[in-house]
């Protein structure tokens, strides 16, 4: 019965997509649309590509988890990728406002539900693939196949740009029609070649076809070799910067100008967003809500941590969502923090304390000595501030740009950055 329901829904989604395209005059064909998919890094990549494009003087649109933008008009986002009718309407409005480029996040849910069927993409970017959304996809293979579907729909003329250092970076582009390109660090992956970088000097990109069988380990001659500087912190942002610069190059943007813009660009709201308090505490808010993302931001925090100081993390796991990542994230938080405060993160219909108990499943008695459990997120943040001293780092993870908390079906205002600033004032 469930299978029949899913098939009926799929047919219905496809019909809606076709009708919407017909009604609005197939607006995506009048735009240069670049989609970004992957578990982490989508928002940063599309937002900065949008900022670069507008800084270069083009009119552009943005469709992201944080917000949708038509030229400069901001429209609240309700989901990562809108339904097919809302999406087509957005494209039509972008066309009417003179947009030439659009940068959009493409979620696995959207791909599974056919929300982007028929969209005229000129390029697609793959960031990475790690544990997430298994409550929806049921297993990792289904999650991967949903992501792969995006690249299978790209036309011959489009580019497909993939993270060669990700274990799925090559596999996700197998058998596709579009032109293949890779980016990454050659010290980690043979497909990469020396080129651009955000925090390191050994980053690069390469055309999948290569140029010749030169003597380097990949058998590929570098397409370019340059250094890129950016304010964005962490290896995960180095990969984002690589994807951004490589995509900009593929779109034909002026490289020197792109590098200049990238050097001074700020991260999107809630993506490793930070400030230093008057008491000398570095406070960071990040959207990290997957095991991989949490580990990345904590490693970055450890990389900038001063001697004899502490990292205090505050995070939880969403209710009515993938329960398998809860013990994994709990362990990651403890390993990479001096003090880990487990708290609520949109518990929705679940008991917050029960979620926290699941986060503790993999912890030893020694691990538990580093853990505090405070289900009230506001009180958890206050406790972190109380424990922090000059030079310490507080990371509040999981919600990022979100300005709400959902508890027992009730959605109320809650903003991690607001709470941190208030507590540290």
Placement of each model-derived feature along the sequence:
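Phosphate-binding loop of NTP-binding sites
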Residues: 2-164, 168-177, 242-251, 305
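ATP-dependent carboxylate-amine ligase
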Residues: 2-11, 188-190, 196-198, 202-205, ...
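A general structural signal for well-ordered alpha-helical segments in protein cores
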Residues: 16, 33, 46, 169, ...
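Acidic, Mg2+-coordinating active-site environments of NTP-dependent enzymes
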Residues: 29-31, 97, 123-283, 306-308, ...
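Short, conserved phosphate/pyrophosphate- and ester-handling motifs at nucleotide-, phospho-/glycolipid
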Residues: 43, 240, 286-290
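Residue-level detection of beta-strand-connecting loop/turn positions
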Residues: 57, 71-73, 225, 280, ...
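Hydrophobic anchor at the start of a short beta-strand
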Residues: 59-60, 101-102, 178-180, 311, ...
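Short, small-residue-rich loop/turn micro-motifs
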Residues: 62-67, 184-185, 398-400
């Amino acid at each position: 019965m469930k299978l029949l329901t899913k098939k009926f829904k799929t047919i219905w989604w496809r019909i809606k997509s076709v009708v919407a395209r017909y009604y609005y005059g197939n607006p995506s064909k009048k735009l240069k649309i670049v989609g970004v998919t992957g578990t982490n890094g989508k928002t940063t990549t599309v937002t900065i590509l949008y900022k670069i494009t507008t800084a270069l003087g083009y009119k552009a649109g943005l469709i992201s988890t944080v917000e949708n933008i038509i030229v400069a008009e901001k429209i609240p986002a309700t989901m990562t990728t809108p339904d097919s009718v809302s999406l087509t309407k957005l494209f039509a409005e972008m066309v009417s406002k003179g947009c030439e480029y659009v940068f959009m996040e493409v979620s696995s849910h959207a791909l599974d539900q056919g929300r982007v069927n028929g969209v005229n993409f000129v390029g697609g970017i793959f960031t990475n693939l790690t544990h997430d959304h298994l409550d929806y996809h049921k297993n990792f293979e289904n999650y991967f196949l949903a992501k792969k579907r995006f690249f299978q729909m790209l036309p011959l003329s489009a580019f497909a740009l993939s993270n060669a250092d990700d274990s799925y970076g090559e596999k996700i582009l197998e058998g596709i029609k579009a032109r293949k390109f890779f980016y990454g660090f050659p010290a980690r992956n043979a497909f990469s070649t020396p080129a651009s970088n955000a925090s390191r000097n050994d980053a690069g990109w390469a055309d999948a076809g290569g140029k010749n069988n030169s003597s380097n380990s990949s058998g590929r001659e570098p397409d370019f070799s340059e250094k890129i500087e950016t304010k964005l912190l962490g290896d995960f942002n180095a990969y984002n910067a690589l994807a951004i610069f490589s995509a900009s190059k593929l779109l034909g943007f002026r490289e020197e100008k792109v590098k200049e813009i990238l050097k001074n660009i700020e991260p999107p709201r809630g993506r490793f967003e930070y400030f230093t308090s008057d008491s000398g505490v570095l406070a960071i808010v990040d959207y990290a809500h997957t095991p991989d993302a949490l580990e990345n931001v904590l490693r970055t925090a450890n990389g900038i941590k001063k001697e004899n100081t502490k990292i205090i993390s505050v995070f939880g796991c969403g209710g009515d969502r993938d329960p398998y990542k809860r013990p994994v994230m709990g362990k990651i938080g403890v390993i990479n923090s001096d003090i880990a405060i487990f708290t609520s993160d949109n518990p929705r219909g679940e008991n917050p304390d029960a979620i926290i108990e699941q986060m503790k499943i993999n912890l030893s008695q020694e691990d538990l000595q580093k853990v505090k459990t405070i289900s009230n997120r506001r009180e958890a943040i206050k406790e972190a501030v109380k424990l922090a001293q000059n030079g310490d780092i507080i990371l509040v993870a999981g919600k990022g740009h979100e300005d709400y908390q959902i508890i027992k079906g009730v959605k109320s205002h809650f903003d991690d950055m607001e709470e941190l600033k208030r507590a540290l004032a």
